[in-house]
Amino acid sequence: MVNLMRKFAKSIGRPGTEFWRGEDMISALPDHLLCHILIFLSTDESVLTSVLSSRWRNLWKWVPRLDLNTSDFPYPNDVTCAAFIDKFLNLYNESYLREFKLRIDQANFRSNVSLYEPCLGVVIKKPNVRHFQVESDLLEHWCTSEIRLTLSACQALVCLKLHLVWLNDFESLSLPCLKIMYLEDVVFPSDAAAETLISCSPVLEDLKLSLHRDDVVVVLRVYSQSLKSFTLKRAVPVYAINGAHTVLVDTPRLVYMSLIDYQFKSFKIISMSDYVKVDLDVDFELMRDELSERNIVYDLLNNFSGVRNMTISWTTLKFIHRFHDMNPLPKFRDLTRLRATMSSDASLEVLRIVLESCPKLKHFHFTLELVNDFPEAVITGFSRVLPRCLVFSLESVEMESPITEKATELKLVRYFLENSATLKKLVLLLNHESTGEKHEPGVLKQLIESPRRSSLCQFEVLAVPPNPEPWWIYVKPQRFL
């Protein structure tokens, strides 16, 4: 309870010790301010304040926000939580609730999530609900039961976040105020339903989609005149059986796009902003036809030939290298800023491919990783023909690397120092703890003092800060919600 009161004190700008010395200043505030303070607590914490005094007994009931975790309710969790929601909704008129958040604990495989469907249907229809969020604490492939939801016209809804929810079909839908929509492992009933959900949101700005393994959408159409940020994530590759085969994107105001675990056969961008930033972490491992795979990779990348800012993962670069001789990488003719990750063993060859594809590159940040997934023989040196960007445009390079057995990182530094005519800054970030390897004495000093093609180039060697979390610490898989 003390911690709760300290939260209150902090929310009004008074230190906890000062709060406890004097009179109860918080309780003297008017009801609407106290309710505003309680908004920053979960509903479970808010209910606890009812025992502070008679002044607080019923205040939690007037907070226009429900933030619930089913694990906080006594067994059977789903029965008691659903009953609590029903009782709360019946206490007040329909214009009261503004925000609803429900986290469903399915760790108990006896959970009955269908109990929530009636009350969720009531909440989503409330005329003044601005934030609606339903999520499960399990990963997609551990989910054993379905949470079904029917969307309807939601005139005030600004933020919609759903995780592991099966959407029922709908004939019409209107979301005139919706700006944020995160749908993670959500199953659409049809192509038309997915398209309608996006197109009926005329002010939508931020869209994140993670397709479920059971999704039946064949053609995913993302048509929006207002969308600014779009993230598309595929189901875990092992489970990617069904789902979209074609993606069409028509988003003229889009300034950020991220593709993760890509498994689509066709991806076409009709329109997007000239200043869009693209993050690519795509994977094609389920395909067996090399010709089709090669064309799909090329067609996907060709969509981004005009972007100016890009981040690309080693997963994607590995496929680019694999088919480079048969189908060269498209020219990223306007790309000036690039972040990339690559295998240290393949970096000498892959770096050449990347630089040759970016004739106007100015700023390059790349990370070397120690991965054993590159069985092909690779070159041990560079071509004498210099990429155009080294001669005319490259201004800054930042490389993060472990100390490798073959000192690959030093070879790359020498390459940039000796060949970059316009380079102004080169930074080598060394991770001294990852491999246990050490450079020969004096080698870094020699490198710092070595001649450079660009007289303006400043070269620095910095240590990567140690990771505060040991490798055995469990890291929760990245989620949208």
From Swiss-Prot:
Residues 23-69 form the F-box domain. Keywords: Leucine-rich repeat, Repeat. SUPFAM superfamilies: F-box domain, RNI-like. Residues 378-430 form the FBD domain. It comes from the Eukaryota. LRR repeats lie at residues 126-153, 159-185, 186-211, 214-234, 236-261, 289-314, 340-368. One of its GO terms (cellular component) is chloroplast. This is F-box/FBD/LRR-repeat protein At5g18770. It comes from Arabidopsis thaliana.
